[in-house]
Amino acid sequence: TTKLYIPPVRPEVVPRPRLIEQFTAGLGHKLTLVSAPAGYGKTTLVSAWLHAADVPFAWLSLDEGDNDPARFFAYLIAALQGIDVEIGRSVQGWLEAPHPPAIESLVTTLINDIARVSTSFVLVLDDHHAITERAIHESIGLLLDRQPSQMHLIIATRHDPPLPLARLRVRGELLELRQSDLRFTAEEATAFLNRSLGLDLSASEVAVLGERTEGWIAGLQLAGLSLQGRDAAGMARFIDEFSGRHQFVLDYLTDEVLKRQAEPVQEFLLRTSILDRLCGSLCDAVVGQDAGPDGAPHQDGQAMLEELQRANLFVVPLDDEREWYRYHHLFAQLLCARLEETRPDLTADLHRRAVAWHEENGLGFG
């Protein structure tokens, strides 16, 4: 099955030695967590490191169908048997039994099998955000708690999994690579646009696109594809006008991000898109306590902002206290465009609420 095969590294992929070094250093930890929104090159980066590193590995690409624990463990064991064919043999028999034992027993047996492996190896769980089944999250948490020293786990995901990350962080057992780490630097953006995509942009043109996209790789790729085949004047005009309202960007963010959110989250995102900076009480004032489209009351603003950050929904914290946030520029532009398109009657009232909150709190707005 293709779920067990590592994606190939294309020749045009931009080398990222600063991140490759971090992966190698991370082998001393239990877990490397690569957590960032869609389009930040998570899978490509993990694949590039494994192709460059001299380390045995097992790869499992997850999807929504893997929320069935029996299916998940079947694929997990198949991946691990690429390291050692004896891993999980007895567990396979249990999975096929009419009344399989408790999942904790399965995981414990699997851990004991891994502990008998003579070589160190890496297990990669890619697209981990597809997993919502609590029993599977608990199984991975148990595996991490008792993880044999031979194994290092890499999880690539669009949002943080419900695992004991705080405990691992305090113990120095966790390496984290996040949106701020994965975004392209100016040098990487130049290499990507001019070498990988075959453009011939000036440093200032690359800088404009880098600033507009905030180093978001998918955004740079969408811009680069749109630039191909244009003359110099057309390129200059496109770069000057490029925003989250560009059709390619609209389509990508709508399909890959916005449509995947629950209705109350979408409503919160749209209503707060008029704000340059967000905090909990400001969001409460703007969103209001009236019920959303599904009849459910809106969630507390601070709790929602914290949830958006955990879910890597293009939210950028502006202070260490996590009081103020902003949306990624292109994402904010998409949300504003969607608000104008779907709820034009709301915009003026949302602005009035925002102005009132700022006046009450002695702050300027706009």
Model regions and ranges:
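Alpha-helical sensor/transducer elements of the RecA-like P-loop NTPase core
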Residues: 2, 18-19, 44-48, 71-74, ...
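Conserved adenine-nucleotide phosphate-binding loops and their immediately adjacent elements
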Residues: 1-23, 89-95, 186, 191
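C-terminal boundary/linker of central alpha/beta nucleotide-binding cores
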Residues: 33, 37-40, 46-50, 116, ...
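Conserved nucleotide-binding/hydrolysis micro-motifs of P-loop NTPases
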Residues: 64-67, 130, 159-162, 182-183, ...
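Hydrophobic "anchor" residues on beta-strands that sit immediately upstream
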Residues: 122-123, 267
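Conserved phosphate-binding/catalytic loops and adjacent sensor/switch elements of nucleotide-binding enzymes
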Residues: 40, 44-121, 128-132, 176
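Pre-Walker A (Motif I) flank of P-loop NTPase domains
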Residues: 28-32
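Extended alpha-helical scaffolding segments used for macromolecular assembly and cargo binding
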Residues: 337, 345-366
